[in-house]
C-alpha cells in the first residue's frame, strides 16, 4: 500500500470536504428554485442520468435512501410534474419511474454557471493533465461509491 504523507492526506481531505460542501450548497440552491428538496433534486438527477426508467428499488440503491423514503421522493417529483410512474412493459407487476420532459428545460440556466466554471478550470490544463485528472475522478467516484454508498 502507498505510504501517504499525513500532510498530503490532510490537504486532499480538506479539498474533498470543501468540494462536497460547495456541491451540496449548489444543489440546495437549485432544488429551492425548482421547488424541491435537495434530496428530491438529487434523486431526479439520478433518474435523468439513467439509461432508462428506474424502479423505486434501484433509485434507493443508487441514492442510499430507504425504499420508503424513495416512495415519498417519487410522490413529490410526480406531483411537481418531473416524473411519472409507468408499468414495466416486460413485467406488469413492476412500476418504473420515468422522467418527463415537463418543465426541466426552464431550469437548464441554473447549471450554466457551474458549466462555465468547469470550462474555465479545465482550460488551464493540457490534455495529458486532463487525462490524469479524469483518471483520478473516475477512481475516486468508484472507490467512494464502493466504500461509502454500498455499505
Segments the model singles out, each with a brief description of its role:
Residues 1-34:
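N-terminal leader segment of winged-helix/HTH proteins
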Residues 1-4, 128-151:
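C-terminal regulatory/oligomerization modules of transcriptional regulators
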Residues 19-26, 63, 106, 110-121, ...:
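Alpha-helical linker/hinge and terminal dimerization helices associated
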Residues 27-65:
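N-terminal helix-turn-helix DNA-binding core of bacterial DNA-binding proteins
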Residues 45, 71-72:
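Base-recognition residues in the alpha-helical recognition helix of bacterial helix-turn-helix
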Residues 73-76, 136:
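Residues within the DNA-recognition helix of helix-turn-helix
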Residues 76-131:
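Charged, amphipathic alpha-helical coiled-coil/dimerization segments
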Amino acid at each position: 500500500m502507498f505510504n501517504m504523507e499525513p500532510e498530503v492526506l490532510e490537504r486532499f481531505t480538506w479539498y474533498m470536504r470543501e468540494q462536497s460542501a460547495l456541491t451540496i450548497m449548489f444543489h440546495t440552491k437549485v432544488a429551492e428554485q425548482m421547488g424541491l428538496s435537495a434530496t428530491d433534486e438529487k434523486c431526479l438527477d439520478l433518474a435523468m442520468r439513467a439509461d432508462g426508467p428506474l424502479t423505486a428499488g434501484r433509485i434507493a440503491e443508487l441514492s442510499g435512501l430507504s425504499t420508503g423514503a424513495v416512495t415519498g421522493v417519487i410522490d413529490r417529483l410526480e406531483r411537481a410534474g418531473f416524473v411519472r410512474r409507468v408499468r414495466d412493459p416486460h413485467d406488469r407487476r413492476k412500476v418504473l419511474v420515468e422522467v418527463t420532459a415537463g418543465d426541466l428545460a426552464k431550469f437548464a440556466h441554473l447549471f450554466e454557471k457551474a458549466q462555465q466554471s468547469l470550462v474555465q478550470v479545465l482550460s488551464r490544463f493540457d490534455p495529458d493533465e486532463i487525462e490524469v485528472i479524469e483518471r483520478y475522478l473516475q477512481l475516486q467516484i468508484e472507490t467512494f461509491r464502493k466504500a461509502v454508498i454500498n455499505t
